[in-house]
Amino acid sequence: MKATPLLLCLACSALAAPPTKKQPEPAEPLPALEKNTIAIDGHPESVAADAEGNIYFTCIGSRLTPTEKDKDGYLGVIPHGSTEPKKITDVDTLDAPKGYQDGFLYCTDVDMVFKINAKTGAIEGYVDLSPSRMKFLNDLAFINGRLMVSSTDTNQIFYVDTNTSSYGELVTKQPIYKPNGLAWDPERKVIYLCEYATDEKGKPSGRLLSINPVSREVTELSKERGQYDGLVYRDNALYYSDWSKDKKPEAVRRLDLKTGRSAPVATGPVEGAADFILYDSMMVVPGMTEKKIHIMPIGGKK
């Protein structure tokens, strides 16, 4: 989250002209990322980048067991300009961590949410959701300033507060199934959600949805179906990863929210495209099943 500066203005006299409003400083350009594929020790699930171009990632460990408490998950960083990943936390610290936001790593870990210092790896807050009996807390996103988490196995989404260790459910008016990626649209004031779901025959049935956090109404955004994972909102469009299009450029797609049209944007195959990010003109995509992180240009027409 961005800190808001507090400006103190002193009036010199009753006739003094009103102070000129200070304009915000232009954002510094992000350091460029080069196209690359980086091998990871374990299965990477989510990524994020800071203003210095360092890429943080969460790894569920050597085995693809995101719902088990096996103590082999860890957090790592790929320093800008390097292709050598480094571990931030010890390998026995976490079970299946996922998610990152802002200057801290906010990790969903089976039935817990942790707030972890991105530089030191120290745990600075947590929320225990085990009383709700879930085993697959998944994506994290700041929704209008509040941290929200999806619970894929119990078909729920929660607001969580790592400072007070409290949480509460956002109960939608229409059902959601296997919720995964979350994103916030500050213009429309809605939550975007994608589902990692299949029907009774094993056919992909996940939807792209919007949720009004006030009315709690759920709206379907597209007739497409998939096994959706990562979700990013940018410039009136949704970018989303789809496990049903594994190993194809369609593994990451873009939905134009004005026209309803979608198109592939990955510029190379990814095996197990998980919780990705957009970084200027590039995307950083974890290849969860192939134990790699891909840095590639964003393709497709806008």
Predicted regions located by residue number:
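A short helix->beta-strand "capping" segment at the edge of beta-propeller domains
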Residues: Q23-D41
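A short beta-strand motif characteristic of beta-propeller blades
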Residues: A32-I38, T83-T89, A122-S130, S166-K173, ...
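Beta-strand-rich domains and repeat architectures in extracellular enzymes and scaffolds
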Residues: T37-K71, D95
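Beta-rich, blade/repeat-based domains predominating
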Residues: D41-E52, T89-L105, S130-M148, P175-V190, ...
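Short, solvent-exposed loop/turn segments at conserved positions within beta-propeller repeat blades
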Residues: T65-D72, S150-D153, D199-S205, S244-P249, ...
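A short loop-to-beta-strand structural motif that recurs across blades of beta-propeller domains
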Residues: P66, K71-G76, M112-F114, Q156-F158, ...
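Short loop/turn segments that connect beta-strands within beta-propeller blades
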Residues: I78-T83, N117-A122, D161-S165, N212-R216, ...
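Hydrophobic alpha-helical segments and helix pairs
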Residues: M112-T162
